[in-house]
Amino acid sequence: VLVGLDRRLDAVYSDAPLSGPVERAFRSVVREYAIPRDVPAALLEGLRWDEEGRGYEELSDLYDYAVRVGSTVGVMMTLVMGRRDAETLADAAELGMAMQLTNICRDVGEDARRGRLYLPARPLSESGMHIEDWLASPAMRPEIANSISLLLDDADRLYARSWKGIARLPSQSRPAIRAASLLYAEIGNEIRSAGFDSVSRRAWTSRGTKLAILARAALFARAPRSAFPAAAGSVGGATGLPDLARQAAAGLVRAASNFRSGAG
């Protein structure tokens, strides 16, 4: 399937006639908004990693994956919303990563029952956990809780750091993006409230919580940019690693911000 998608992407970024309506529509979008091929190609690479069943030994490996399946979406959306400065694109990339980290933390049990583990494997193994045995019979363990806790902390830093980027978006776009970021961050809060157990349960937000978040997002759209100071602190600090998020997304952001016209 993905080989076919690669060929279709090549065709979109060529000058050859296109017969399919999806390809024609996507070519129109990438040309109108100057979306470089590197961005959707990175998304397809992340999907290929999923198809291969790839695991992630280190936190840095997991960020490389999150860039491909999360940051790419944020960057493409930001380009379509008319912003292509490097700072706003970097914030969008980090927001995409934050949402992907939240997804991973929410779906630990669901993924495990399909034989998949996205949490960084080396720290789990070094703590004495036998990953293959655990995947054969998933159950909540302190090592899993600790890994989820660390990832959610990083996700929260990324959500906070994305605020200024959202404030730089067109006013009509801000409420939806802010609402999405708040809803995903709230999923992280629900996981914390359950003692980080996303093996035996799946976190969700109530209708009342969703409505309250939508109201907060609407207020955010009218607030001045100065109301949202940049969040301090690097991501990945708990592991002693450098700022993994911005480093991991740097190439993607550079390609998107420097690409101005044409389809390839």
Residue ranges and their predicted role:
Residues 1-99, 105, 109-264:
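Catalytic cores of Mg2+-dependent Asp-rich isoprenoid enzymes
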